Amino acid sequence: MKKLLLLLILLIFAAKVTAEEWAGADEKAEEVIKELKPDYEPWFSPIFEPPSGEIESMLFSLQAAIGSLIIGYFLGYYRGLKHARNA
C-alpha cells in the first residue's frame, strides 16, 4: 500500500512540473557558456542531428526503454537465481 501511495504522489508531482524544469543539462550548460563566453566555438559537432524535436524525443525515449529493459532483465534474472537457491 505504501508503494502505491508513493507512486501516486510521484505521478502527481511529475504532472505538475513544467517542461522548463525538465530541460536537458546540455541545454542549460550551453546557455551558461554563451553567457560567460559569447565567442566560444564548439570543438565537436554531432554525427547525427535529428530533423525535429519530436524525433529527438522519440530516440531518447527509445534509448531509455532499451536501458530499462536491460536493467529489468538482469534484476529479474538475479532475483530468480536467489529464489532458486532458497528453494
Curated annotation (Swiss-Prot):
One of its GO terms (molecular function) is cobalt ion transmembrane transporter activity. GO terms for biological process: cobalamin biosynthetic process. The keyword Repeat does not apply. It is found in: Cell membrane. GO terms for cellular component: plasma membrane. Pathway: Cofactor biosynthesis; adenosylcobalamin biosynthesis. Disulfide bonds: none annotated. InterPro entries: CbiN. The chain crosses the membrane at residues 4-24, 58-78. It comes from the Archaea. It is a multi-pass membrane protein. Keywords: Cell membrane, Cobalamin biosynthesis, Cobalt, Cobalt transport, Ion transport, Membrane, Transmembrane, Transmembrane helix, Transport. Belongs to the CbiN family. Forms an energy-coupling factor (ECF) transporter complex composed of an ATP-binding protein (A component, CbiO), a transmembrane protein (T component, CbiQ) and 2 possible substrate-capture proteins (S components, CbiM and CbiN) of unknown stoichimetry. Part of the energy-coupling factor (ECF) transporter complex CbiMNOQ involved in cobalt import. This is Cobalt transport protein CbiN.
